Amino acid sequence: ELSFLGRIHSVDDVSRAYDAARSAGFANINLDFIFGLPNQSPPVWAATLEKAIALAPEHLSLYSLIVEPETPLFHWVETGRVPAPDDDLAGELYETAMERLADAGYVQYEVSNWGKKGLGTGDWRLGRPLSDPQSPVPCHHNLLYWRNQEYIGVGPGAHSHMRLPFEHPTATPSAEGAGLRWSNRKPVPGYIKRVQAGEAVVDFWEEIDSRTAMGETMMLGLRLVKEGVSRARFRRRHGVEMDAIFADELARLYSQGMLQSDGESVRLTERGLMLGNQVFAAFLP
């Protein structure tokens, strides 16, 4: 499977790298996996999960395969060399992972992410000790994305996101209160050349209007399956009530059994978790 995905490492390489990281003193390790490969064997996937659990990492990220354009896999699927990924098979493998990881003491706190139970923090942003032994250790870095917060990327290919208004030459009145995102040039030689010449390294930027920003808050926040999207946080972020903007979308998704609400926040149901892309798409312009 690793070779099929174009990875140059082996399963043994993973184990050796993991052991080396532990020996070096790392106490918080994540392992990434991709599932939903064409014709992927459920028993082989189950064995992969067992190997991951046996290593006992603090965090696991499991991503469903996406066939990206301009990749060898895309060409193979287009030419019929390999079949397209099967959504039903991917769903079966996903359910297997959810059940087995829960049994092994991992808490699913995001659509694709699990943390070992009891290693989280009371306030993930402040790093305060936890009193709840059921809380997982999260990926602090990605929480910024899922909460639609600001971040600055440095270096080739790095992405950044800032809210407006702020002092930036591209800011316009129409973008006020929303945001701006940009990315740097990817090839390292070209990036270095621009820096040495005193030229801008930004290759792409776009203003995010208020409606798009609100939709992204919903789309990203709903990925946090335990936390969801807080109505109070939405109000603070955008200056309006969530239900005033997305009344129709919320009503439809409630009726379809995709979303649930406790009055303070909106979260995915089990059905919504399995059909997350349909839910997320409902909030984008």
Residue ranges and their predicted role:
Residues 254-264:
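A short, conserved structural fragment
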Residues 1-240:
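C-terminal scaffold of the Radical SAM
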Residues 265-269:
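Minor-groove-contacting beta-hairpin "wing" of winged helix-turn-helix DNA-binding domains
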Residues 215-218, 249, 279:
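Structural preference for long, well-ordered alpha-helical segments in enzyme cores
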Residues 271-285:
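Short, amphipathic alpha-helical interaction segments positioned at domain boundaries
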Residues 239-254:
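Short amphipathic alpha-helical interaction segments
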